[in-house]
Structures are given as structure tokens and as C-alpha cells.
Amino acid sequence: MTETQNTSRRPGALIAMSGGVDSSVAAWLMQRDGFDCTGVTMRLTRNEAVNTEGLHTCCSERDIEDAAEVAYAMDIPYEVLDFTADFQEKIIDKFIRVYEAGGTPNPCIDCNRYMKFDHLLRWAEAHGLDHVVTGHYARVEQDEATGRWLLKKGLDENKDQSYVLYNLTQEQLAHVRLPLGGLHKSEVRAIAEQQHFVNARKHDLSLIHISEPTRQ
């Protein structure tokens, strides 16, 4: 991703909005800090798949509505991107293969790697946005001596999510922003309530839960 040469414009940020409180507050923090924000929600499944296959993800139709309402309240552009085909191929089908082979798949890690921090980074670049922002409780810092980007645990030990981001590349880490890494969950909820976000008291969203595949 090429950094802008026009230093007069505000940096752009794609906010990966799941419809939950964390990504909503991440969006608010970035806007407060002077970024031009665009909210984006990934459509991962159709409702029929959720109801019939035991698959539960964030970014359901209700979550999309919540994300859109927060984006409207913040007066930022908002898009829903349809990744259902890739999600089926790269996440669901892989989960089933690994499970049936006796392994222990982790679809959240794969979704972050192949969907959120691949597709969204490329979409951000194509639309002139400098960063992808998520509501993960983790931190990204640059080592001054080596110039390498370091992934660190979030300060809230009870909510740390750095483990699901362990396989991000240096190129990806350079363009990722995690504004919740230095906050505790209670602080995040307090901000959401102060801003009167519709999802301020919403339960935490697990990105993906796939129930045991039915064997014939």
C-alpha cells in the first residue's frame, strides 16, 4: 500500500465494523484523532446458511444494521462488501476438511488472515485509504532500532486477542491500526454509552462459531 504524497489531506482509515461495540468505538477513536473514516462490514454468510448449517458469525443482518446506524451517527461513509463465496471456500470448507481429518481448526485465525487483513487491505488501497482499523484488543508498535512492526498483547489481559493476529505479515502490520489495544473493556463500553451508540450494551461477538458438522 502506497502512502499518500499529499501531506495536506487527512489520512484515510477503513474501519472493519462488525456491528459490535468494539469496532464502533475503534471508529469513533480514529475519527476523534483526525482520520477520514469509512466503515465497512463484511457479509460472510447468507441468513439461510446461519439457520441451517449451525454457523454463527458476526456481521449478521442485525449486526449490519447496527454498524450502519453507528456509521450514520458518526456521519461517515459505510459499505457492505459481499465475501460469501470466499468465506465458504477459504474458511468453512477448510474447517470441515481439518475437522474431519481429526484436527482442531481455528476459523477466526483464518478469517483474520484471508478475509479481514487480505481483502480489506486491498480494498482500502484501491480506495485511497491508508489504514485498516479493527476492534481487536492488541497493539502494533514499530521497533525504533530495527524498523520492524511488533504485535503485542492488549493491556486488558482478560480481552487480549493478539493470538488471533499472530500470522499477519510486516506489510499488513504496517497498515493496521488497533486503537483499543491500550484500553480496558469497561472503558470501551463507557465511551459507547457516552456516544449513545445503539450497541453500547451489546454482548461481545465471537467472529465465528461453527457447530459440529453433521455426519450422514
What residue spans do the PLM features occupy?
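Active-site and glycan-interaction determinants of carbohydrate-active enzymes
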Residues: 195
